[in-house]
Amino acid sequence: MATTYIAYVLWPRWPGPAIDPNAPALPIVVAGVTFNVPPAAIRAPVQRRPGTQDRIDLSFLWPSLEPPDANAKPSVPAQGALAAPTPAFERIFVTISAGGSSVPPAERVLTIYPRYTAAEASPGPDGLTVLAFRDGTPYQGEDLIYDAEAPGFLVRCTRRAGPTPGTCLYERWIETVKLVLRFPRDWLTDWRAVASNIDRLIASLRPSRG
């Protein structure tokens, strides 16, 4: 039931008109950077418009990276009934916003995280390294997970708490814009495919050149 509740909370419930799944991508500008966004991927109807916006919140089906059916509604099982498998954890969520005064991940690793992490790392899934944040710090209950052999893949993840699965945040900057992608920690067992799909997703949101 916990995963069903999370799916219900994550599902956008703002009222809005039906969306044509074949509608063309919207040119949206965030902090001077242009993105071409499928309307069905935009979670809030108020953000489904072209032009300049402060931020946009998106979701895509995984691993196809297709926009979800924005006209579908989540189902809540009857009391006492077993919950059906939820699609919430077959999605990747993306927030695009101005970077502003935020510190990029590469700098955070050098100047902020070392103050809060444990002294020693431990092996993670599929060759990754896990560095736990200490209790009593702002990141308590989270881990820093990265590829020690090559730079580029770094996520901050919550740990599983009972039936609630862990969630990872992956951050990418494009000029002055910050993209934060959220996905289940369990996906890290195939993190190389995750990283490749993230690259493909971000590239699909950018205007084509040439």
Where are these regions (language model features)?
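Surface-exposed amphipathic alpha-helical segments
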Residues: 175-210
